[in-house]
Curated annotation (Swiss-Prot):
This is Aminomethyltransferase. Its EC number is 2.1.2.10. Keywords: Aminotransferase, Transferase. The keyword Ribosomal protein does not apply. The gene is gcvT. GO terms for biological process: glycine decarboxylation via glycine cleavage system. Gene3D superfamilies: Probable tRNA modification gtpase trme, domain 1. GO terms for cellular component: cytosol; glycine cleavage complex. The glycine cleavage system catalyzes the degradation of glycine. It is an enzyme of class 2 (transferase). Coiled coil: none annotated.
Length: 367
């Protein structure tokens, strides 16, 4: 019997312990799951501002002549739609149309693209790129190059203003700035559905920026927030989480991510399979479920129309905003389920009535 591998640690573990964080494993990393409590942190983010350390996210750099053109030939979305100083949600797919990972591509210039991926999938993304990279380009796994600090919520702009960081940035844009001599990439991105920013300081200098952010967030009546709140926030928005709503077995079309595919491009990994699936229609589709009564839904529950199984829940939580249980579920297309329809979820042998809704469950405020 071999011992389990030791969990990786981010650059701010000591700071989180000082703040009283509870920790859990995420993608092989030991990360803060909560401080004051998930519901409190969720509400602070929706109503004021939350500060999240997501430094476990992967980073990779593609550099060399024609880097943007190469990345555009591999990842699904069309980099030709954006320009330097902009970021784009995209996917890295297998040739069979499954998802290796979903990620954000930062367009630095034609010869440099910076990628942020899910923690556990960084090596797989790098491997997929390396397998088809032409001579003259380098792909570097930079997992520990930068911390990632997400400042999310209606008062996020006030927080960045307190630090003298730029705020007049278009959604999905970014600016390279500095704080107290520390370079910081300020990105108008997030995973909560709120207006927000993601800051990328160097790994070794992250504490300088984090300490200042904590003080400014508290002054703005916000809270440090853990990955527990990040999950409830993204579930309310219907945002996919890799391993739940996206995987090698769950295609972008099934997860309603077809908008992140450049269908008119000549090439990207999985193109033929995804075009065929688009023509035929996906065999299942991501739906939202809202409980009619009290309780909480969890992943892996069977969804039924009457007594007939028609799908499975992929994520589920109690929505602090709506004060009701919500879930995301993959529902068979042949079941012809409609928004507003009542269906049943089997919760440990108990038939729980839910309404089918189209995510998001609450209003998007990212812009």
């Amino acid at each position: 019997m071999t011992d389990a591998p030791e969990l990786l640690k981010g650059p701010l573990e000591d700071r989180h312990r000082e703040l009283g964080a509870n920790f859990a494993e995420f993608g092989g990393w030991l990360m803060p799951v909560s401080y004051a409590g998930t519901v409190s942190e969720h509400s602070a983010t929706r109503n004021a501002v939350g500060l999240f350390d997501v430094s476990h996210l992967g980073k990779a750099l593609v550099r060399g002549p024609g880097a943007a053109q190469f990345v555009n030939s591999v990842l699904t979305n069309d980099l030709g739609r954006i320009r330097p100083g902009k970021a784009q949600y995209t996917l890295c797919c297998s040739e069979s149309g499954g998802v290796i990972d979903d990620l954000i591509a930062y367009y630095v210039d034609d010869d440099e693209i910076f990628l942020v991926s899910n923690a556990a999938n960084t090596a797989a993304v790098v491997d997929a790129l390396q397998a088809v990279v032409p001579a003259g380009l380098t792909i570097i796994n930079q997992h520990r190059s930068h911390a990632v600090l997400a400042v999310q919520g209606p008062r996020s702009t006030d927080v960045l203003g307190e630090l003298g960081l730029p705020t007049g940035i278009d959604y999905m844009g970014y600016v390279d700035a500095s704080y107290a001599g520390v370079p910081v990439r300020v990105c108008r991105t997030g995973y909560t559905g709120e207006q927000g920013y993601e800051l990328l300081p160097p790994w070794e200098s992250a504490d300088v920026v984090f300490d200042a952010l904590v003080a400014a967030v508290v002054d703005a009546r916000g809270e440090p927030a853990g990955l527990g709140a990040r999950d409830t926030l993204r579930t309310e928005m219907g945002y996919p989480l890799y391993g739940h709503e996206l995987s090698l077995d769950i295609s972008p079309l099934q997860a309603r991510c077809g908008w992140a595919i450049g269908w008119k491009k000549d090439a990207f990994l999985g193109r033929d399979a995804l075009l065929a699936e688009k023509a035929a229609g996906p065999r299942r589709l991501l739906r939202g479920l809202r409980m009619a009564g009290r309780g909480v839904l969890r992943p892996g529950l069977t969804v039924c129309a009457g007594d007939i199984p028609i799908g499975v829940t992929t994520s589920g939580t109690f929505s602090p905003t709506l004060q009701v249980g919500v879930a995301l579920a993959l529902i068979d297309s042949e079941a012809a389920v409609q928004d507003g329809q009542q269906i049943i979820v089997d919760v440990r042998g108990r038939a729980v009535e839910c309404e089918v809704v189209r995510p998001p469950f609450i209003e998007v405020k990212t812009r």
